[in-house]
Amino acid sequence: MEKTSLKLVFLFSLTVIALCLSLSAAREMAKEEVNCIGGHCPDGKKDCNCLPLIAPTMDIYETNESCRTDNECIKYCPKGCKIVDCNFGTCLCEYC
């Protein structure tokens, strides 16, 4: 009986220690998540790892212009598009 109760106390102690360690690790992760607000360090914070905000790029631009060949779409797509296609009668401009 005494060996069983010692094993239970030991097991309970290990469980409590593991729980405390996991809670402290979760608290540290929560602190790191709020370092950057809007891509900048909040006031009072010195060591932030804020990455610059990147503007989204438009990969595909679909016009409402009808077409029969790819060459017809060149005049409707913005300059600098790498791929200009006539796709099922609609001009598609890609990688602009």
From Swiss-Prot:
One of its GO terms (biological process) is defense response to fungus. Keywords: Antimicrobial, Disulfide bond, Fungicide, Plant defense, Secreted, Signal. Residues 1-26 form the signal peptide. The keyword Disulfide bond applies. It is found in: Secreted. One of its GO terms (cellular component) is extracellular region. Disulfide bonds join 48-96, 67-86, 73-91, 77-93. Belongs to the DEFL family. This is Putative defensin-like protein 263. It comes from Arabidopsis thaliana (Mouse-ear cress).
